[in-house]
UniProtKB/Swiss-Prot annotation:
Taxonomic classification: Bacteria, Bacillati, Cyanobacteriota, Cyanophyceae, Oscillatoriophycideae
Organism from which the protein derives: Microcystis aeruginosa (strain NIES-843 / IAM M-2473)
Gene3D superfamilies documented for this protein: Putative methyltransferase TM0872, insert domain, Vaccinia Virus protein VP39
Keyword Nucleus: no
Protein name: Ribosomal RNA small subunit methyltransferase H
Residues annotated for S-adenosyl-L-methionine binding in this entry: G35, G36, H37, D54, D98, Q105
InterPro entries: RsmH, SAM-dep_MeTrfase_MraW_recog, SAM-dependent_MTases_sf
GO BP field: rRNA base methylation
EC numbers, comma separated: 2.1.1.199
One term under GO cellular component: cytoplasm
Subcellular location(s) of the protein: Cytoplasm
GO molecular function: rRNA (cytosine-N4-)-methyltransferase activity
Family: Belongs to the methyltransferase superfamily. RsmH family.
Enzymatic reactions: cytidine(1402) in 16S rRNA + S-adenosyl-L-methionine = N(4)-methylcytidine(1402) in 16S rRNA + S-adenosyl-L-homocysteine + H(+)
Role description: Specifically methylates the N4 position of cytidine in position 1402 (C1402) of 16S rRNA.
Amino acid sequence: MNQDFPHISVLSQELIAGLNIQPGGHYLDLTLGGGGHSRLLLEAHPETTVTAIDRDQSALEAAKISLAPYLDSRLTLWWGNFADYDGQNSSFDGIIADLGVSSPQFDQSERGFSFRHTAALDMRMDRCQSLTAADIINHWHEKELADLFYQYGEERLSRPIARSIVQKRPFTTTTELAAVIASSVPASYRYGRIHPATRVFQALRIAVNQELDSLQQLLDQAPHWLKSRGIIAMISFHSLEDRLIKYGFRENNSLKIITKKPIIPSREEQAKNPRSRSAKLRIAQKIESEVI
């Protein structure tokens, strides 16, 4: 685990086993994060090479330290949104993605991803971009907010929540917003299994970082970057991501689905890492090209 960007990789063994690592293979890690999966790829065989991407510069800076022995010779780092990566001139034996927010991003209160700490409403994975969660909350129309919470957060009380937000804005902090969301829903919902702000914060994060649009672009492009019989493995953390991956794999004629049902963490892994509970791993393989 990278101590400067501490993140416990989820479903690591299942992911590596599913990739069927090839000696001297070239692999693409679309979500470097704490570097756990990239490290496992590099350790799988002494000649394996990895290209790793992250839109969060702090993850890349941390990886330059934790994965220093592999840099230049076997590991290449690329900063940016994976949807903007041009892999047309590459040919990978495997591609992996561990989607969503990493533990450091959640735990660093100043990033504004969590309402457990008071922080500015930010939520940017790439802190060089301009749009923040505060921009959305304070400037979007009520209907736009309600639609956002419903579509990206699957929040059934999106309309009363949006109404309360518009009435009481502007907002500057995460806890201030979370309190208003909680006060706008019935008590039975307010004290339910999850905090009533959870789905709203998910929706805001997805919108700020254009997560679903980026994922759809990736699903359209990534199979073209695979060698014949190359494998793509993707870990999702909520139903919107999983649905896109499921149908993206199914509708691509160049892919054969390996996992008929998604692989989920074992009870042991869930006990050790509660954040893994919602993870789902889907794997597909590029169909072998016919020789003409």
